[in-house]
Amino acid sequence: MNKLMSIITIGIVLFSTSCKDDEINLVSVEQNATITDQSVTEAYFNEAGDLSIQAFNTPTPNEIAGGRTNGTITITVEGDTRFNGAIVTLTTSGNDPLNPEGTITIDFGDGQTDPRGVVRKGIIIVNYKGLRFVPGSKTITTFDNYEVNGVGIEGTRTITTSSFSVTPALSVSFLVKDVDGKATFSDQTTITRNATHSHTITFGNTPGSTTWTVEGQASGKTRTEVEYIFLIERPLIFKTECVFKGFSMPSEGEALFTIGNLPVGLNYGDEGAACDNVVTVSINNGTQNITVNN
């Protein structure tokens, strides 16, 4: 499940944006830059949240609870090359094994480069409280001089388990909130972000039949100080079937990305749509299909 979350959360990007040369470009250079910047910000915040969940899911229940005594241990996140070179530590602070508390730090130091060429610097700090997947348990993620490819990330992401069900299928739901989020680019311009989403993972009988549903909205200001809202109008559906085929975008769902007073509709696919990386963009009474780069 952790690998699924890694792939899917990165795929939440709005559309990171290059059109084919033979397509009519309905989006201005400025609008395209705004959409691209928002895509980067969305991706980096979701990845940071995923890294925190990955780290939280790695220790044993006894290590999370601290055993009989509190202390600090170093943990290793297996199978995820994004953690290459990072030092991950777990410090427990609570004294109730049924309601454990502690802090996980993911320290990339002065810079670590993963096999895909992504450079991460600084520290992700994950404070947790409660047993994994138990309703009410949560992780609170903050940052200490954290950067991805030169883009600084700030803010607080809180992930709270809202429900756990075994019928009609095994599923876990989370409430995800971003508060005072900010991405700072190399020219010191920023994108701000506040967001509230609900995430639900529904596990199928086979690895390729698991789905991930995302609802909610994000809002803030662009690098040019224009207000924006990204509202999911029809739940975004991610499928492991599609991920395994190399398609990281949602296979279904719609969103409205409003930049200032300009509404931009995004359609990722209707119910039962085939796996692809095509987004239908609606703008100024016209539509255009854009193929997204993974």
Question: Could you describe each region identified by the protein language model?
Answer:
Residues 21-294:
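Low-complexity, intrinsically disordered segments exposed to solvent
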Residues 15-18:
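C-terminal motif of bacterial Sec signal peptides marking the signal peptidase cleavage site
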Residues 2-10:
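Sec-dependent signal peptide recognition
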